[in-house]
């Protein structure tokens, strides 16, 4: 959208200080004006200059379409674009990154052929009775519901959130599951938590808080765990620096007798890397046990993580706790356990292909989390291509999610681990309420 079409949305107000001029373009989403400086005599910066202003035409940058560049200067811009510099720096770093190997966690299976909407809908209609039959034969027992709460998270985190505690409730339950499953740090048992798809590192931060506070409540001093944070993005407002600050603050509040120079800070390592390319063994400290964690690891990223863990140093892998989400964003070719689905099809629908059935599962899985408008009854069909009422679509969506998740659970069970699917939070807290808990057998 051109700048001229949005200028009218800018709230009226006083004139800008000529000595501190800023671009007059108003950013509705950020509720403020653009912070860039325009050229002398201009109201807008180059990025937001209206297209009819007589200035040179601008086009999206091919490297990063979030910004534009004068068309006449495109060639020179590509050589100095920040994205080019970032890519060059990343390539240079990779030459000295033993934990990077392109595609090391990708599956060898060829990619599934793309299906148009008509083909996909036909596959869904064919898969519905197959899914119902599989569920009746294989998944009759419901998942264990274990909505837990961690006292340390409630003590530190909850007072900071007077209203919306949905994320904190999920973190509290996941952290308590780690504790009760024996996937917990202690002064005599140092561990490293590896958070996949970490984002800002929020889950790891509160694991750190809970572990340190628990040790201090027992008389301290605390021995915080180590953390390895993995994400392919580089989000703003990361929590990395907060880990040490939290340890210092908790010591000051609950164990002030420990001198500041004797308060150990956690080792926090962040790597910007796609899980697909991660060689985990090269990131871990020798002799240190590790535990994988993640909250709402999206779609195919869960399958890449499972293969990453299986290919890593299993002798030091104590276990994993992964809250999964977005089965509709999976990939038949990258799914961790296609043999599991193929075996089910061989028993219940030998004439249906794995690829089409999995694509149908992905489509149906979205029905469980799409939600309803207020007041929509269970019997509402709403012109849906399946002809099924919304309550039945939701039920089938949960069955599709269960099948995808059961294959992941079986993947680790086949490696000799104790693996369990469980409901870790209330549905009104999050519709993505299933976690995979993996433990090394005793």
Swiss-Prot record:
- Per the UniProt record, which residue ranges are transmembrane? none
Query: Under the cellular component aspect of Gene Ontology, which terms does the record hold?
Result: cytoplasm; nucleolus
Q: Where does Zn(2+) bind?
A: 61, 67, 77, 81
Q: What is its EC number?
A: 2.1.1.225
Task: Kindly state which reaction or reactions the protein catalyses.
Answer: cytidine(4) in tRNA(Pro) + S-adenosyl-L-methionine = 2'-O-methylcytidine(4) in tRNA(Pro) + S-adenosyl-L-homocysteine + H(+); cytidine(4) in tRNA(Gly)(GCC) + S-adenosyl-L-methionine = 2'-O-methylcytidine(4) in tRNA(Gly)(GCC) + S-adenosyl-L-homocysteine + H(+); adenosine(4) in tRNA(His) + S-adenosyl-L-methionine = 2'-O-methyladenosine(4) in tRNA(His) + S-adenosyl-L-homocysteine + H(+)
Show the segment(s) annotated as Disordered: 1-21
What are the entry keywords?
Cytoplasm, Metal-binding, Methyltransferase, Nucleus, S-adenosyl-L-methionine, Transferase, tRNA processing, Zinc, Zinc-finger
* Alphabetized GO MF terms: tRNA 2'-O-methyltransferase activity; tRNA methyltransferase activity; zinc ion binding
> Where is this protein found?
Cytoplasm; Nucleus, Nucleolus
First and last residues of each zinc finger (CHHC U11-48K-type)? 58-85
Biological process terms from the Gene Ontology for this record are: tRNA methylation; tRNA nucleoside ribose methylation
Q: What does the protein in this record do?
A: tRNA methylase which 2'-O-methylates cytidine(4) in tRNA(Pro) and tRNA(Gly)(GCC), and adenosine(4) in tRNA(His).
Q: Which family does it belong to?
A: Belongs to the methyltransferase TRM13 family.
This protein's name: tRNA:m(4)X modification enzyme TRM13
């Amino acid at each position: 959208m051109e700048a001229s079409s949005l200028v009218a949305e800018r709230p009226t107000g006083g004139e800008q200080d000529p000595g501190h001029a800023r671009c007059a373009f108003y950013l509705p989403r950020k509720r403020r004006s653009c912070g860039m400086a325009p050229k002398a005599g201009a109201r807008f910066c180059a990025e937001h200059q209206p297209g009819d202003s007589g200035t040179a035409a601008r086009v999206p940058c091919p490297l990063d379409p979030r910004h534009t560049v004068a068309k006449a200067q495109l060639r020179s811009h590509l050589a100095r674009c920040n994205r080019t510099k970032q890519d060059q720096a990343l390539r240079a770093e990779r030459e000295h990154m033993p934990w990077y190997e392109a595609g090391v966690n990708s599956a060898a299976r060829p990619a599934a052929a793309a299906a148009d909407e008509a083909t996909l809908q036909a596959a869904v209609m064919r898969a519905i009775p197959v899914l119902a039959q599989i569920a009746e034969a294989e998944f009759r027992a419901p998942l264990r519901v274990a909505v837990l709460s961690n006292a340390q998270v409630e003590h530190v985190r909850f007072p900071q959130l007077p209203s919306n505690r949905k994320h904190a409730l999920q973190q509290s339950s996941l952290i308590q599951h780690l504790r009760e499953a024996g996937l917990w740090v202690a002064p005599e048992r140092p561990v490293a938590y590896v958070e996949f798809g970490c984002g800002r590192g929020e889950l790891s931060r509160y694991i750190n808080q809970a572990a340190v506070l628990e040790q201090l409540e027992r008389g301290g001093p605390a021995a915080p765990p180590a953390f390895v944070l993995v994400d392919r993005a580089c989000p703003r407002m990361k929590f990395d620096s907060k880990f040490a600050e939290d340890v210092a603050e908790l010591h000051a509040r609950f164990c002030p007798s420990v001198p500041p120079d004797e308060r150990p800070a956690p080792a926090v390592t962040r790597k910007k890397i796609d899980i697909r390319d991660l060689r985990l063994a090269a990131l871990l400290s020798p002799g240190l046990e590790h535990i994988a964690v993640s909250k709402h690891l999206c779609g195919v990223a869960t399958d890449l993580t499972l293969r990453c863990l299986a290919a890593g140093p299993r002798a030091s892998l104590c276990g994993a706790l992964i809250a999964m989400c977005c089965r509709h964003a999976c990939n038949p070719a990258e799914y961790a356990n296609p043999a599991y689905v193929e075996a089910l099809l061989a028993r219940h629908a030998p004439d249906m292909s794995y690829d089409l059935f999995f694509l149908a599962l992905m489509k149906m899985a979205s029905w469980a989390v799409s939600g309803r408008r207020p007041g929509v009854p269970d019997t509402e069909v709403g012109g849906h291509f399946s002809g099924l009422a919304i309550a039945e679509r939701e039920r089938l969506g949960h069955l599709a999610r269960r099948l995808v998740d059961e294959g992941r659970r079986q993947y680790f069970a086949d490696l000799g681990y104790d693996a369990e699917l469980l409901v870790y939070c209330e549905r009104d807290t999050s519709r993505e309420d299933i976690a995979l808990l993996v433990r090394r057998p005793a």
